[in-house]
């Protein structure tokens, strides 16, 4: 259970990041445009997300594939313009980046704070994992949106890798059973393997799928079952991408 101090800290971070969202969002958008990144069906993706959000009352767990260091940034850009995040705070998604990546320097720590990041220690001690799960459960219970990568890190094989699945995503759902799940598949068309940043001028393919995993198991078996269902849906979306998209492979 989270301490009152930790809960207050998350609420303060939410207020501060929300107050500065326009500055943060459009500064990062300027960098994305400088890199000449584009999402061809941006308006369509945003309209689909807006329709899903209009039906939502509880927390939203966004589950995505993971190939680069800026996947969370690409996904937030794809889902909503900055002005809409300003008027609809629940659309501004919390992230769970690796603590080592977000703590490189003071600027990155500040950017992470304003970007609603909750740094996590990969493969940390059990108490650290429990604290992270409690934070996610708290955020979801307040109707917030949280982005997670079920693989736990960037895929080393260039595709969704079921061998790397972390069952924490299943435990998050167990801790917030009312939360909805949104699977997001996002990939640069020129992406061959994992990397730090997509190539300049990259075009991104983004697809959404509302998902409602269920399980009859309990405990760890339930965590595993839910996590594998989510990853299975992401794999299906990836297969559709390679099978039907007209791509420059």
Identify what each model region corresponds to:
Residues 1-93, 104-116:
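Membrane-anchoring hydrophobic helices of lipid-metabolizing enzymes
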Residues 205, 211-213, 221-242, 246:
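A conserved mid-domain beta-alpha-beta active-site/ligand-binding segment of alpha/beta enzyme cores
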Residues 7, 106-109, 145, 152, ...:
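A cross-family acyltransferase "interaction/gating" segment
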Residues 42, 125-130, 162-163, 223:
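A conditional alpha-helix N-cap/helix-loop micro-motif detector
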Residues 96, 118, 180-184:
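Hydrophobic/aromatic beta-strand patches that form the interior of the parallel beta-sheet core
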Residues 58-64, 143-150, 179:
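Generic beta-sheet signal
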């Amino acid at each position: 259970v989270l301490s009152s101090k930790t809960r207050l800290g998350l609420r303060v971070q939410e207020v501060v990041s929300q107050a500065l969202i326009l500055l943060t969002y459009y500064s990062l958008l300027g960098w994305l445009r400088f890199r000449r990144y584009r999402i061809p069906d941006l308006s369509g993706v945003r309209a689909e997300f807006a329709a899903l959000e209009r039906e939502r009352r509880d927390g939203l767990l966004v589950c995505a594939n993971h190939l680069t260091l800026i996947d969370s940034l690409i996904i937030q850009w794809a889902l909503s313009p900055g002005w809409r995040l300003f008027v609809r705070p629940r659309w501004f998604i919390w992230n769970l980046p690796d603590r080592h990546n977000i703590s490189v320097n003071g600027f990155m720590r500040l950017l992470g704070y304003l970007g609603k990041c909750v740094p996590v220690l990969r493969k940390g001690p059990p108490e650290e994992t429990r604290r992270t799960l409690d934070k996610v459960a708290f955020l979801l219970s307040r109707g917030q949106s949280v982005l997670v990568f079920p693989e736990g890190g960037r895929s080393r094989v260039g595709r969704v890798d079921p061998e790397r699945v972390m069952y924490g995503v299943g435990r998050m759902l167990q801790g917030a059973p009312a939360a909805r799940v949104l699977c997001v598949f996002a990939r640069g068309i020129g992406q061959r393997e994992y990397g730090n940043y997509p190539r300049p001028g990259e075009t991104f393919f983004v697809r959404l799928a509302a998902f409602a995993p269920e399980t009859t198991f309990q405990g760890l078996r339930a965590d595993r079952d839910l996590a594998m269902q989510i990853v299975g849906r992401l794999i299906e979306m990836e297969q559709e991408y390679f099978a039907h998209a007209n791509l420059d492979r």
